[in-house]
């Protein structure tokens, strides 16, 4: 942050040891990129395997993909509405799958036990930079959804049902990404740390039930994030009368 005239203490907060990549004056958390590429590769591999030989009577990976498709379609339709949900299904589905696989990777893979020359690996969603980026992406998406569908009429949302709501609606635009990012970050980081500590202290049996609990929590967090993203988009495209 050398290009800023003042120091930002919050930006200096860190959890764990990081693998840094230096690109010019920009310092990046390299472990987030590494594990994100692994997650994206796993998702692409799943899609390739599931769609390589499509059959009328699905089974195996194709059956799983069709189940996910139906699930995400129903989620988007419920939260966004019949008229607009098709446009946002790919976005909601991508969010859900990336967060879901990232979270499960954090629960199943003891990343912190994989030694690097410097730093340590971890689930992408256990890094605040990732969750904030995802939350800001959701914010940009619902602004875009509202403006592209309604034009300047989108700003009627801020005075509905009464102009007194304007400051509250503006504050809400800041609290939405904050709550999305910190909820996901806190839950996944806590799960990773608990599993890593238990694996270190009692490496055989005790971590197993905690890992299963982590899998359940990870799936719920992915569902909550995707559902709230779809809800915010649906709220933005909703017509107020």
From Swiss-Prot:
Source taxon at top rank: Bacteria
Entries under PROSITE patterns matching the protein: ATPASE_A
Indicate where this protein resides in the cell. Answer: Cellular thylakoid membrane
Q: Spell out the Gene3D superfamilies in the cross-references.
A: ATP synthase, F0 complex, subunit A (1.20.120.220)
Task: State which residue ranges cross the membrane.
Answer: 30-50, 91-111, 128-148, 193-213, 214-234
Q: Which UniProt keywords apply?
A: ATP synthesis, CF(0), Hydrogen ion transport, Ion transport, Membrane, Thylakoid, Transmembrane, Transmembrane helix, Transport
State which gene encodes it: atpB
Q: What membrane topology does the annotation report for this chain? A: Multi-pass membrane protein
What GO MF terms are annotated? proton-transporting ATP synthase activity, rotational mechanism
Q: How does it assemble?
A: F-type ATPases have 2 components, CF(1) - the catalytic core - and CF(0) - the membrane proton channel. CF(1) has five subunits: alpha(3), beta(3), gamma(1), delta(1), epsilon(1). CF(0) has four main subunits: a, b, b' and c.
What are the GO cellular component annotations? plasma membrane-derived thylakoid membrane; proton-transporting ATP synthase complex
Species annotation? Prochlorococcus marinus (strain MIT 9303)
Q: Does the keyword Transmembrane helix apply?
A: yes
Q: Which family does it belong to?
A: Belongs to the ATPase A chain family.
NCBIfam families with a match to the protein in the record: ATP_synt_6_or_A
Which Pfam family is one of this chain's hits? Answer: ATP-synt_A
Q: Which HAMAP family match?
A: ATP_synth_a_bact
Keyword Ion transport in annotation: yes
Its predominant location is membrane
Q: What does the record give as the function of this protein?
A: Key component of the proton channel; it plays a direct role in the translocation of protons across the membrane.
Record's protein name: ATP synthase subunit a
């Amino acid at each position: 942050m050398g290009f800023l005239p003042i120091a930002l203490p919050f930006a200096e907060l860190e959890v764990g040891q990081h693998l840094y990549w230096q690109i010019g004056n920009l310092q990046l958390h390299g472990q987030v990129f590494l594990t994100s590429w692994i997650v994206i590769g796993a998702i692409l591999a799943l899609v390739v395997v599931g769609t390589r030989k499509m059959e009328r009577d699905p089974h195996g990976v194709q059956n799983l993909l069709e189940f996910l498709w139906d699930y995400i379609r129903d989620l988007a339709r419920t939260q966004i509405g019949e008229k607009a949900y098709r446009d946002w299904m790919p976005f909601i589905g991508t969010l859900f799958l990336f967060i879901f696989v990232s979270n499960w990777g954090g629960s199943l893979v003891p990343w912190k036990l994989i030694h690097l020359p410097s730093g340590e690996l971890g689930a992408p969603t256990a890094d605040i930079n990732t969750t904030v980026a995802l939350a800001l992406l959701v914010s940009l998406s619902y602004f875009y959804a509202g403006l592209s569908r309604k034009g300047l009429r989108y700003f009627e949302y801020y005075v509905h049902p009464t102009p007194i709501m304007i400051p509250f609606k503006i504050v809400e635009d800041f609290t939405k990404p904050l709550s999305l990012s910190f909820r996901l970050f806190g839950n996944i980081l806590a799960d990773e740390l608990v599993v890593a500590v238990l694996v270190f202290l009692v490496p055989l049996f005790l971590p197993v039930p905690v890992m299963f609990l982590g899998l359940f929590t990870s799936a719920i967090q992915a569902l909550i994030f995707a559902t709230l993203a779809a809800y915010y988009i649906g709220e933005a495209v909703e017509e107020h009368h």
